[in-house]
A protein has these predicted regions:
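Short, well-ordered beta-strand segments enriched in hydrophobic/aromatic residues
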Residues: 87-95, 507-515, 594-596
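C-terminal beta-strand-rich structural cap/linker in extracellular carbohydrate-active enzymes
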Residues: 549-585, 634-637
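Active-site-proximal substrate-binding groove within the catalytic cores of carbohydrate-active enzymes
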Residues: 189-199, 376-524, 529
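Edge beta-strands of extracellular beta-sandwich domains
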Residues: 572-585, 617-619, 648-674
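Short, aromatic- and glycine-rich surface loops/edge beta-strands on solvent-exposed regions
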Residues: 91, 562-571, 607, 636-657
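Aromatic-lined carbohydrate-binding/catalytic grooves of carbohydrate-active enzymes
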Residues: 254-365
Length: 679
């Protein structure tokens, strides 16, 4: 194979100091077979033994590499000078055969040499991207919509030095070929370029992934304008976890027979099932838009009671803690010559809405936010699709579209920008959807229930109760799920159970997802205990004690069994959630009395008879040392009493005491008068 290799090195040192700062890779040295023989890291040249191919790729069903190339392709390599000092090469592939070929699964190095690998697997039309770890089942992952074909790999080059590398296809470079989601079809003589980026890191494989996905944002943009994310008035959406999207003619919004609005009843119902909706979105346009000469703004005006009635519903919803969204259809040309941004401004002004669903959009553009800002602060743009990294500066929220049914388990968009508010779109009418709620919970984001399609099956309340359980944990620990302490896929002692870590300022959460139908209970992952913290299972509400094994500390996890026939359906799976919390509370039982001690007084204490649940109320107390009568507040309840300390609705600590069935309810000695003998 003919190869033209151009090595031109100009070092360029930027002035920005990264939080992930590492020595940049100055060069990757190749042998004559395009194998990596050494890495120049600062002033140190590290030899690789054995060497590894620079890249691997597939043509059709066959796998090749730079060391063992396809006879149908040639490629050249050109060094790019980057302002950030990181290493970038352009790999140019040319189809030199007389056949039409499909080039795909282009990734750095070789699968055998990597600590972690991301590339395609299978033939799914929308979702093939998988993350591979040694001796583990591959994990299907979600990546940005402009990067489904990406390849990622990490290798160790020395005791503490590692290389993370990324390949990205240059869509605009395709000549005499066709771009598909995962493949590039090259006709004879066709060409396509891939960019290969490489940077150094140390630590576990997740550190390299975080550098590439979060620090470099997949090299989609060189600088990120964070101004929208810094705005206090827009931060509320990142702490929101349940929304419903419905038609304006839905029975839950308006009763045609009675001629009255029913939305507030729907919102009240939701409070008992899943803690209520942070957002409700009303859709009066598609699919009726286009049936007559009215444009989208006319359709809003023609609703019962007009825009004033919608404004009233928005106000009533906010009283219940729910923001009110309207929709916008950019494809509506209509018959009204009014500028769309002015039309949107007028609609927001008339309805006092709190946000806009941007139909068919995956980004916003500042014109949309500017139009909203003229009305009032805090109006959020919410796109139908998920913004790619270079579009994220224009919008603060988006969704995992329901076009991707049975979505991948791990969403790497969450790693890219943890502050970006993500909602998974789920539909109730098709089948039970516990997996939708479970995977959203595992990834630390919310759920949009799209109930446009008619149907409220008899199992809806059961599913909503599961959503309530996941959403409570998300809400009460929201700052962990929006902080930059996300580490995906911690090492576990067993396969088919996955653990994500979410570090915050004073506590750490672990979300766990299982597809083991037989259930699981046992030591699962490694932890670092200390005297100031303890471990609590927030899903099962029980205290946990780490166990030492092989010189390491391990924590026990537990997941429920589920029918094996549900594997592969949207109702598969089980979850757990474990927290390492600061020790603030101490509790004990003394007959009929619960003794509570707290080292903090700023917040609130809640006592639950059994597990916390939105369908019941907790006993709410001041944060102080106190004694509580169990029978007075909970009657004859026997079982676990869950005691929580919260500050501004955020869980700080939890402890549990068990009142064993049949325990005598003796009063405290100080409260019982002395009994004199009768004779």
């Amino acid at each position: 194979m003919k190869q033209a290799i151009l090595f031109t090195l100009i070092l360029f040192f930027g002035t920005t100091i990264s939080l992930f700062a590492q020595n940049p890779i100055q060069d990757i040295l190749l042998d004559s077979n395009l194998r990596v023989r050494a890495v120049q890291l600062g002033d140190q040249k590290i030899e690789l033994n054995p060497s590894t191919p620079l890249i691997s790729y597939s043509v059709g069903e066959e796998q090749f590499s730079s060391s063992f190339p396809s006879s149908k392709l040639t490629f050249s390599i050109e060094k790019v000078n980057r302002l950030d000092g990181e290493l970038e090469w352009i790999l140019s592939f040319t189809n030199t055969s007389a056949d039409t070929i499909q080039l795909h699964n282009v990734y750095p190095f070789s699968a055998e040499k990597t600590e972690v690998l991301i590339t395609g697997k299978g033939k799914h039309s929308l979702s093939r991207t998988h993350l591979f770890l040694p001796s583990r089942s591959p994990v299907n992952v979600i990546v940005p919509d402009n990067a489904w074909e990406l390849g990622y790999a990490a290798i160790s080059i020395a005791a503490k030095d590692k290389v993370a590398a990324l390949t990205r296809r240059d869509r605009e470079s395709i000549q005499n070929g066709t771009r598909r989601r995962f493949e590039t079809v090259l006709f004879p003589g066709g060409k396509v370029n891939y960019h290969l980026y490489a940077l150094s890191y140390s630590g576990d494989w997740q550190a390299g992934l975080t550098r590439v996905f979060q620090e470099k944002m997949l090299f989609d943009l060189s600088e990120f304008d964070n101004s929208l994310f810094d705005r206090e008035d827009l931060k509320w959406i990142r702490h929101s976890y349940v929304m419903h999207l419905m038609y304006a003619w839905d029975k839950f919004y308006y009763d045609l027979e009675k001629g009255e609005y029913t939305l507030q009843d729907f919102l009240e119902r939701g409070k008992k099932l899943y803690g209520g909706d942070e957002v409700i979105s009303i859709w009066p346009t598609w699919p009726t838009l286009g049936l007559d000469q009215r444009n989208q703004f006319d359709l809003f005006k023609d609703l019962p009671g007009g825009l004033e009635a919608m404004k009233n519903q928005a106000s009533l919803s906010r009283e219940k803690g729910t923001r009110f969204f309207v929709c916008y259809n950019p494809w509506d040309e209509g018959t009204n010559s009014k500028n769309h941004f002015e039309g949107l401004y007028d609609l927001l002004l008339a309805t006092d809405a709190d946000g806009v669903v941007l139909d068919t959009k995956a980004e916003a553009g500042r014109e949309f936010q500017d139009a909203a800002d003229r009305v009032k602060p805090g109006v959020v743009m919410y796109s139908e699709g998920m913004a790619i990294p270079k579009a994220m500066p224009t919008i603060v929220s988006g969704r995992v579209h329901n076009a991707l049914y049975y979505p991948p388990m791990l969403n790497l968009n969450k790693l890219i920008k943890p502050e970006f508010a993500i909602f998974r779109v789920a539909e109730l009418f098709k089948e039970k959807i516990r997996r939708e709620f479970a995977t959203a919970f595992f990834n630390g984001y919310g759920t949009e229930l799209n109930i446009m399609a008619p149907g409220q099956p008899d199992w809806v309340e059961e599913q909503y109760a599961f959503l309530g359980k996941t959403s409570r944990i998300l809400r009460e620990n929201t700052f962990n799920f929006t902080a930059r302490g996300f580490t995906p896929l911690l090492p576990t002692r067993v396969d088919s159970l996955w653990v994500n870590e979410w570090k915050g300022e004073e506590k750490t959460l672990y979300t766990i997802y299982s597809i083991r139908p037989q259930g699981f209970k046992g030591l699962l992952y490694e932890v670092e205990p200390n005297e100031e913290t303890h471990f609590v299972d927030l899903w099962h509400h029980k205290l946990l004690s780490p166990m030492e094994k092989d010189g390491k500390w391990w924590i026990e996890a537990q997941t429920e069994a589920f029918p094996e026939y549900e594997l592969g359906t949207n109702n598969e799976g089980a979850v757990d959630c474990i927290a390492q919390l600061p020790i603030v509370l101490k509790a004990s039982l003394d007959g009929d009395f619960l003794n509570i001690q707290t080292s903090r007084s700023k917040g609130q204490i809640r006592v639950w008879a059994g597990a916390p649940n939105y369908a019941k109320d907790a006993l709410e107390l001041e944060a102080k040392v106190q004694q509580v009568s169990i029978s007075e507040h909970f009657g004859r309840f026997e079982g676990d009493l869950v005691i929580q300390y919260l500050e501004d609705g955020i869980l700080v600590d939890e402890t549990i005491v068990n009142l064993k069935p049949g325990t005598p309810r003796t009063a405290c000695p100080a409260c019982v008068p002395l009994v004199q003998p009768c004779c």
